[in-house]
Amino acid sequence: MSRRAEVTRNTSETQIRVALDLDGTGKQTLNTGVPFLDHMLDQIARHGMVDLDVSATGDTHIDDHHTVEDVGITLGQAVAKAIGDKKGIVRYGHSYVPLDEALSRVVIDFSGRPGLEFHVPFTRARVGNFDVDLSIEFFRGFVNHAGVTLHIDNLRGVNAHHQIETVFKAFGRALRMAVEIDPRAAGTIPSTKGAL
């Protein structure tokens, strides 16, 4: 069973293409025009063992908001398309990831019900040129279009770069756990309702 997808999103603000393989090895080609976002997408690919090819052109002459948000939206659409009817998946995933003084926890549920709880007390407003508030916009876009419930908590951290990086690494690892095929589930949908 192939769990690959390609999605394009074209608006007056951005042109986005995401191709992924949920059963990959972490290979990635990233060109969003936002270097820090490329760095974070690399964390998702490597720690989620997802092959990821993302290209984006956006109105970054204004700021990075539309590009970051729309990449999150398109990634969410691609994950939803690749995962299909969710038969046989584990459904839930979680991960704790440290980076020096920072520690983050991410928990995901492929419930079909979009919901985001994002609790990251950033210690500064920017990491280089990247506005840290855009990280919540990325995950909000992802959640709303992947149809997942996502809890993100930075439990401690002093360096804002470390705070964000632990979040993205933990997200990749939680995603990997949730989309794994459970051989004991025998292709059933992981819900007592029989649908997600």
UniProtKB/Swiss-Prot annotation:
InterPro entries the record matches: IGPD_sf (IPR038494), ImidazoleglycerolP_deHydtase (IPR000807), ImidazoleglycerP_deHydtase_CS (IPR020565), Ribosomal_Su5_D2-typ_SF (IPR020568)
A single MF term (Gene Ontology): imidazoleglycerol-phosphate dehydratase activity
Matching Pfam families: IGPD (PF00475)
EC nos: 4.2.1.19
Catalytic activity: D-erythro-1-(imidazol-4-yl)glycerol 3-phosphate = 3-(imidazol-4-yl)-2-oxopropyl phosphate + H2O
Keyword tags: Amino-acid biosynthesis, Cytoplasm, Histidine biosynthesis, Lyase
Main localization of the protein described in the UniProt heading: cytoplasm
Entry keyword annotation includes Amino-acid biosynthesis: yes
Family membership noted in the UniProt record: Belongs to the imidazoleglycerol-phosphate dehydratase family.
Name listed for the protein in its UniProt record: Imidazoleglycerol-phosphate dehydratase
